[in-house]
């Protein structure tokens, strides 16, 4: 196994949730030798401003990059052009009215608050949707001229995203931009919208103990995935220790 050069983690339910565990993760991260410490990427459904606010209220280490809106935004504080370069390859902003006209016929669906929306992410609540219902919504969107895909997680959160966007695609783009291999990357998460990170060829994964079955079932039995016996940030620490310590040392 190659050294870990980039670590991409979801926030809520993964490194965020229990502040004491989050503080232990920050301490662990700071204890890694600076010269070999991986780049830290937060990869959340939260929009970037929301993540920056969260950083002020919970004891997280500072990230090198922030991916927001389920892979539709990418930011680094000292590299403003990066965000534009990333979003420009995702295509034009959605027509919110077209999406709303499709969704109005879906029983039980409701629009999420404004803080979860932006031009390339239309987010809705829909409880316990099955695959057929999701496929039908996606087909109707495409029939109405909305070139989009659906990411559904937690049996509740439905995100309409550009065809080229999800948490995994954002990591692939960033790794390519940085010249880092996916086989030098570790990812961590707890729900279905994290699955796209785990599906990347060559990555190593950490699934926390409190993860939903939609992610655990995907990771079970895969040699490059570990399901940690601890929850949230404590599970992340265990998983990272496993993958960092299992790196081949040069002979």
Enumerate the predicted regions with their spans.
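Mg2+-dependent phosphoryl-transfer enzymes with acidic/Ser/Thr/Gly-rich catalytic loops
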Residues: 2, 22, 161, 168-251
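Asp-based phosphoryl-transfer active-site loop
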Residues: 2-20, 198
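The start of beta-strands in P-loop NTPase/AAA+ ATPase cores
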Residues: 5-7, 64, 185
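Active-site metal-binding loops of divalent metal-dependent hydrolases
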Residues: 11, 46, 190-191
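Active-site phosphate-binding/coordination module
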Residues: 18, 23-114, 210
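Conserved acidic, metal-coordinating active-site core of Asp-based
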Residues: 97-201
């Amino acid at each position: 196994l190659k050294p870990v050069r980039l670590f991409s983690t979801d926030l809520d339910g993964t490194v965020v949730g229990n502040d004491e565990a989050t503080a232990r993760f920050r301490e662990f991260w700071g204890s890694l030798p600076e010269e070999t410490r991986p780049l830290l990427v937060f990869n959340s459904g939260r929009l970037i401003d929301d993540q920056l606010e969260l950083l002020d209220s919970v004891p997280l280490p500072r990230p090198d990059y922030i991916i927001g809106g389920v892979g539709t935004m990418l930011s680094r504080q000292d590299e403003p052009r990066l965000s534009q370069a990333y979003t420009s390859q995702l295509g034009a902003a959605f027509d919110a009215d077209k999406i709303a006209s499709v969704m109005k016929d879906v029983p039980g669906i409701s629009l999420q608050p404004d803080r979860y929306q932006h031009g390339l992410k239309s987010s809705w609540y829909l409880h316990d949707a099955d695959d057929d219902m999701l496929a039908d919504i996606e087909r109707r969107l495409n029939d109405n001229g909305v070139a989009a895909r659906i990411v559904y997680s937690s049996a509740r959160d439905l995100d309409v995203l550009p065809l080229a966007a999800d948490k995994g695609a954002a990591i692939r783009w960033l790794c390519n931009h940085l010249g880092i291999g996916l086989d030098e990357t570790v990812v961590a998460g707890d729900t279905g919208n994290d699955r796209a990170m785990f599906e990347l060829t060559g990555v190593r994964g950490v699934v926390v103990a409190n993860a939903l079955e939609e992610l655990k079932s995907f990771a079970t039995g895969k040699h490059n995935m570990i399901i940690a016996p601890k929850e949230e940030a404590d599970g992340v620490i265990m998983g990272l220790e496993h993958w960092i310590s299992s790196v081949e040392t040069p002979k």
